[in-house]
Amino acid sequence: MPFVVVITGIPGVGKSTITRLALQRTRAKFRVVNFGDIMFQEAVKAGWVSHRDEVRKLSLKVQRELQLKAAQRILEISQKEPVLLDTHATIKTPLGYMLGFPREVIEVINPRFMVIIEANPSEILGRRLRDLKRDRDVETEDQIQRHQDLNRAATISYAMHSNALIKIIENHEDKGLEEAVNELVKILDLAVNEDA
């Protein structure tokens, strides 16, 4: 039976770092799949983009097509091994925010658990400014908070369509990365035990 745990958070929240460190400590065995990477691979194959950050600037129709292709690939993988899906619940596009999982996509992936990583907007802004590898939009702290609020709302909607459980993990500078990683390890261990 397919088994997917979604981990989401807005760019700069520390989602990928927390995921990487948690997987080194958990007893559970997951294959990490990045939803955006699969969309990017499909877009490159089609000749639409050459850089990952260009995907979110494609037309909504093309992005939705890429989302569905990615979902189908993830389903195939999850039928063979548990998947930890690193993704975004909402994507900021030039026209507004797009759902990371439209109904037809969430129904294909059908996750068991959804983990949201959050932080204070000032922390996220600082992390984004230090990350020179990515072409990130410049946003105010208010815009960052709005994006996090949209992520929560979207994740609740996804859970309604998949019956997934939701967990929010805070990744604050003062709280420490270690605590956030430990929380994710607990969730991953419980998720696999819950499925057994």
From Swiss-Prot:
Keyword field contains Endoplasmic reticulum: no
Reaction(s) this enzyme catalyzes, per UniProt: AMP + ATP = 2 ADP
Compartments in which it is found: Cytoplasm
Gene Ontology, cellular component aspect: cytoplasm
Keyword Transferase: yes
Keywords: ATP-binding, Cytoplasm, Kinase, Nucleotide-binding, Transferase
InterPro entries the UniProt entry points to: Adenylate_kinase_AdkA, P-loop_NTPase
Broad class of where this protein is predominantly found: cytoplasm
EC number from the UniProt entry: 2.7.4.3
Chain residues that bind ATP: G9, I10, P11, G12, V13, G14, K15, S16, T17
One of the record's GO molecular function terms: adenylate kinase activity
One Pfam match: AAA_17
Enzyme class per UniProt: transferase
Listed NCBIfam families: PRK04040.1
Family of this protein: Belongs to the archaeal adenylate kinase family.
HAMAP family listed in its UniProt record: Adenylate_kinase_AdkA
Name of this chain's protein: Adenylate kinase
Native organism: Thermococcus sibiricus (strain DSM 12597 / MM 739)
